[in-house]
Amino acid sequence: MVVSDVAGSQSRYDAVLVGAGIMSATLAALLHELDPELSLLMVERLQAPGLESSAAENNAGTGHAANCELNYTPLQPDGSVATAKALAINTAFERSLEFWASLTEKGKLLPQQFLHLVPHISVVFGDADLAFLHQRFQQLSALPAFASMQWSTDVAELAEWMPLVMEGRANAESVAATCIKRGTDVDFGLLTGAYVKSLQASGALELSCGCEVVHLHRLGKHQWNLDLKHSSGSRSVQTPFVFLGAGGGALPLLQRSGIPEAAAYAGFPVSGQWLVCSEPGLTARHHAKVYGKAKVGAPPMSVPHLDSRWIDGCRSLLFGPYAGFSSKFLKQGSRLDLLRSVRRSNFRSMLEVGFKNFDLVTYLLSELQQSEKDRFETLKQFLPNAQLNDWKLSVAGQRVQIIKRTAEGGRLQMGTEVVSAQDGSLAALLGASPGASTAVTVMLEVLQRCWSERMASESWQQRLRKLLPSYGHDPNSEPLLLTQMRIRSNKLLNFT
């Protein structure tokens, strides 16, 4: 991977992407496929792409398709579960698979390097949660997107699906699970690197690592200047389009841009930790992503799950994440990040969210006070036979949830949101979960907002339909199209 020397680089680009994570890399890949002549600059403060939230050990969940994440189907007052969010996330992930399949067909990606088939399982304990999971199963399995979902309370079958979870469990305990065999684990750090390497080979992308944006300001309509600081010197670059895809670092940059749209936003940082096992005798026996049910008041990134996960090509088990609080906006950020983000325009919203979500703040602080024994006891609820010596504590990535000023006051949002300038010359991605798995869909939204004329052109429309054969259609209302999408993706991505 080539990292440019700032002093010898050009000064004008068609697009500058700040942050070399999965979002910026996906946007760069889409832009290059739509117009190979575009010149792109990617700026990263760390020494290589994909080291912050996109890295496998930092990502709260990989391969999100709403197959097993129970927080995407909340229980409703009438006893049913809401399915709209699960359907939207599943469709978004299918679109990501569709894009990766197209780049694989072109020889630009090797899916075996970052993509692995892993069953997705939801598991619950106790009669009340069994009733919830069965209701979820009945509703989702009736939809084409989740038609392959299986349900079981049979101990022998559950032991086949998740042997480590069932071993040592009391026979009297009520257990139920659902399973979708066509699930995945995705190493978004490796995928980010693959995107960047391919784009560099084409000559379309210049990557500048160890480089920070110290200032950005408008020069005029559709014109931005960015002042960059690098170990080898400083320079200024100009561009008609800026994307702020720097994870938790996007909010401070958005605020520095001065666009009026930024005034409505603040950030609520959430940290996390994993228990990680690399013992081959255990990693070989657990081949699934097993998601449980979050505690009442817990944030989405704290949904307990036991993950088969490939980290830099090596198979591991991750359990957690254990939530916590840190004032940093990035794992490799500053403890002053939260304080520095406070503005007159967002201070009231931050206070209102603090009061409205006091239980959440209390929960996060209590998680911080957990001892090694406390964390291990939580693990044993999932793995009754777990041995402490097989697991080590690892710090997960930092998430910055959105605080947004609304007519009803400050509101805490747990998803992601694209914030863009009125003229489309700048866009930022704020928030977290489901994040990386929906990158293609989210970056298409950025293109629709900020490159609307080009997106409406016949040349871009033709290229989009080749890249994404389902583009412009809703697979959830066209079951045959969904089947065709999956057959194509399965074939090109070697899902066997």
From Swiss-Prot:
The cofactor(s) it depends on are:
FAD
Q: In which pathway does it act?
A: Carbohydrate metabolism; tricarboxylic acid cycle; oxaloacetate from (S)-malate (quinone route): step 1/1
Provide the alphabetized UniProt keywords: FAD, Flavoprotein, Oxidoreductase, Tricarboxylic acid cycle
EC annotation?
1.1.5.4
Origin superkingdom: Bacteria
Q: Which reaction does it catalyse?
A: (S)-malate + a quinone = a quinol + oxaloacetate
InterPro entries cross-referenced by the UniProt entry: FAD/NAD-bd_sf (IPR036188), MQO (IPR006231)
Enzyme class name: oxidoreductase
GO MF annotation list: 2-hydroxyglutarate dehydrogenase activity; L-malate dehydrogenase (quinone) activity
What Gene Ontology biological process does one annotation of this record name? Answer: tricarboxylic acid cycle
In the record, the note on similarity to other proteins reads: Belongs to the MQO family.
Q: What is the name of this protein?
A: Probable malate:quinone oxidoreductase
Q: Which organism is it from?
A: Prochlorococcus marinus (strain MIT 9313)
Gene behind this protein: mqo
